[in-house]
Amino acid sequence: MGLGLSLAKPSQEILVLDGDGGLLMNLGSLVTISNADPKNFIHIVFDDGVYYTTGSQPISGKDKYDFKSIAIGSGIEQSYSFDDLEIFSAEFELLLNEDGPIFISLKIEHKKTLMDAWVGNTKEHSRKIKKYLEGNKLLLLFINF
C-alpha cells in the first residue's frame, strides 16, 4: 500500500513504518519497491526480534539475518541499519533530503510488558500515534505495525 501511495503521490514524501515480523512475511516487497524505484519512499523497520502483533513470539533465527543486507540484495542501494537512537535521529534528518527508495532497519529493544499495554487497544494507540505525528511534512502509513 505504501508503494502504491508513493507512486500515486510523487510530490508527497511517504514514510512506511513496519515491523520485522511483518517484513519477514513479505520479503518480496523489497524487490518490488526496488523495481518501482520511488524517489519519495522511506521504509523503516522496527527490528525487535519478535512477532509483535501475534503475541511477541521470538522470531526464529533472528540473529542469522540482516535486514540492511537483504534490502541491498533486493536492489535498494540506500539501505541503513541503526542500533543507537541518537545516531538514528541525527542521520534521519539528513536522509529526509535524499532521493529514495530508502530502507532503514532500526534495532530496538523489545519490552516484555509492551504487548500487555496494546492488547485490545491497538486502534486507539495507533490513533494517538497518528495524531501526535500530524503536522509533519511526511504522510505516515502504518503497515504491519
Predicted regions and their residues:
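Short glycine-rich anion-binding loops that position phosphate/pyrophosphate groups of nucleotides
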Residues: G21-G22, G49, I108-K111
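Conserved thiamine diphosphate
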Residues: P58-L94
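General beta-strand structural signal in soluble alpha/beta enzymes
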Residues: V16-L17, Y80-D83, L106
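Thiamine diphosphate
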Residues: M1-D47
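Active-site-proximal loop->helix
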Residues: N26-A36, T53-I70
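Conserved beta-strand scaffold positions in the cores of enzyme catalytic domains, especially
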Residues: H43, S79-S81, F103
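Glycine/aspartate-rich loop-and-adjacent alpha/beta segment that forms the canonical ThDP
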Residues: N97-F145
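Short active-site-adjacent structural elements
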Residues: Y52-T54, E91, K111-D116
